[in-house]
């Protein structure tokens, strides 16, 4: 019986790359694996898929196959045959297919277990707006794991040392077989460390690390804002058995301010003015983060008008120009008026009457003219 083309076996084109070949192989190997497929021809198809994969993922064998076809691997042709006498090691195949899950890129082979780097930590820091804009130094206390001083982080009592695990021979992993299946898992004897501590340190009980609250000084750069993160390298948890420590990330949150709101590099505030000043003009004192300044209020200023004070905002921690302070004027209505004051206001209002009223209250005139037109249209 003639042999099928290897590209046809895997269902890929002749221009397929190694990634596509491997993807097709995994899919077909799972489909025809004898432990999953009880059909009579499943084993033969499985062997065929395995052989095609081995040839097409070996650069030299693939080049020979592309030039000579199956003849390149027939006995006596100098190609050396397909290897393995046409048999298939289902345990190895399982490792190839699931190696990235159980054994990493090593295709299910044992890998040296290393002491793990320490975990990163996060500290939430609240700053006032002034602290965030100007920068400051803060002292913080962080509960963490540090290397044990008694054993220098080894976990073993002074004068002793850890020995190689006899179960995994220092690899940290063992292979468990169930029928055709081969699965790698952490060594149950040394818990994946590859070493056994027979005489543990009394201070850390063989862990190499102890709990401690560290006091750290954190320098906050000027211009930080909510959401910014400051990294303190090596100030996280100590690593296992002398491995590098993790990092500490200080997460910044800027508290609300009683006067200012921040948006990027700009600051916003509301400035109340009397209706008299809004009408006739004047000056009002405005606070900034660098002191007080006077803002000129033009006559006939309406409530909600914005005034920009350039360079009175924030300089970003990332550099660039300083932002602006944007002041929104709010005209206050007087309250707690005496009878005399109310009479004076009524006289002022009456002085706006007559045909010239519109020029004193342009928005009111426009509004009421619009209302009149609206009802005229409804009834017309």
From Swiss-Prot:
PROSITE patterns, alphabetized: DNAJ_1, DNAJ_2, ZF_CR
Q: Where in the cell is it found?
A: Cytoplasm
Report the Gene3D superfamilies cross-referenced here.
Answer: DnaJ domain, Heat shock protein DnaJ, cysteine-rich domain, Urease metallochaperone UreE, N-terminal domain
Which cofactors, by name?
A: Zn(2+)
Q: Which residues does the UniProt record annotate as the domain J?
A: 5-69
Q: One GO cellular component term, please give it.
A: cytoplasm
The main location class comes to cytoplasm
The molecular function GO annotations come to:
ATP binding; heat shock protein binding; unfolded protein binding; zinc ion binding
CXXCXGXG motif repeats mapped onto the chain = 148-155, 165-172, 187-194, 201-208
- Binding of Zn(2+) 2 occurs at 165, 168, 187, 190
The record's cofactor note says: Binds 2 Zn(2+) ions per monomer.
What InterPro entries does this protein map onto?
A: DnaJ, DnaJ_C, DnaJ_domain, DnaJ_domain_CS, HSP40/DnaJ_pept-bd, HSP_DnaJ_Cys-rich_dom, HSP_DnaJ_Cys-rich_dom_sf, J_dom_sf
Which UniProt keywords are listed? Answer: Chaperone, Cytoplasm, DNA replication, Metal-binding, Repeat, Stress response, Zinc, Zinc-finger
Set out the biological process GO terms recorded for this chain's protein.
chaperone cofactor-dependent protein refolding; DNA replication; protein refolding; response to heat
Q: Where are the zinc fingers (CR-type)?
A: 135-213
Please state what the annotation says regarding this protein's domains. Answer: The J domain is necessary and sufficient to stimulate DnaK ATPase activity. Zinc center 1 plays an important role in the autonomous, DnaK-independent chaperone activity of DnaJ. Zinc center 2 is essential for interaction with DnaK and for DnaJ activity.
Subunit structure, interactors included: Homodimer.
Similarity annotation: Belongs to the DnaJ family.
The entry's protein name is: Chaperone protein DnaJ
Q: What is the lineage of its organism?
A: Bacteria, Pseudomonadati, Pseudomonadota, Gammaproteobacteria, Vibrionales
Question: What gene name is given for the protein in this entry?
Answer: dnaJ
């Amino acid at each position: 019986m003639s042999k099928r083309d290897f590209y046809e076996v895997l269902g890929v084109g002749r221009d397929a790359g190694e990634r596509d070949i491997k993807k097709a192989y995994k899919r077909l190997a799972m489909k025809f694996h004898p432990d999953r497929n009880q059909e009579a021809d499943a084993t033969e198809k499985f062997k065929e898929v395995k052989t095609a994969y081995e040839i097409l993922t070996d650069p030299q064998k693939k080049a020979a196959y592309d030039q000579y076809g199956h003849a390149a691997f027939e006995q006596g042709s100098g190609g050396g045959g397909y290897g393995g006498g046409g048999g298939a090691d289902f345990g190895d195949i399982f490792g190839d297919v699931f190696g990235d899950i159980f054994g990493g890129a090593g295709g299910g082979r044992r890998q040296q277990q290393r002491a793990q780097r320490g975990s990163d930590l996060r500290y939430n820091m609240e700053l006032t707006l002034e602290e965030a804009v100007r920068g400051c130094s803060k002292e913080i206390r962080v509960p963490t794991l540090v290397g044990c001083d008694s054993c220098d982080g080894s976990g073993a009592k002074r004068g002793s040392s850890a020995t190689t695990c006899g179960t995994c021979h220092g690899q940290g992993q063992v292979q468990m077989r169930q029928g055709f299946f081969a699965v790698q898992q952490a060594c149950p004897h040394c818990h994946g460390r590859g070493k056994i501590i027979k005489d543990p340190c009394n201070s850390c009980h063989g862990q190499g690390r102890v709990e401690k609250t560290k006091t750290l000084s954190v320098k906050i750069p000027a211009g930080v804002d909510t959401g910014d993160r400051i990294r303190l390298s090596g100030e996280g948890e100590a690593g296992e058995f002398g491995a590098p420590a993790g990092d500490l990330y200080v997460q910044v949150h800027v508290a609300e301010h009683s006067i200012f709101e921040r948006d990027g590099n700009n600051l916003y505030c509301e400035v109340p003015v009397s209706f008299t000043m809004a009408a006739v003009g004047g000056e009002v004192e405005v606070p900034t983060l660098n002191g007080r300044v006077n803002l000129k209020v033009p006559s006939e200023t309406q409530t909600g008008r914005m005034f920009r004070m350039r360079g009175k905002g924030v300089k970003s921690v990332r550099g660039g120009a300083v932002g602006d302070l944007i002041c929104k004027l709010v005209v206050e209505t007087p309250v707690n008026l005496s009878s005399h004051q109310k009479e004076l206001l009524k006289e002022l209002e009456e002085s706006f009457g007559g045909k010239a009223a519109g020029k004193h209250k342009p928005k009111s005139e426009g509004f009421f003219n619009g209302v009149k037109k609206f009802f005229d249209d409804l009834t017309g």
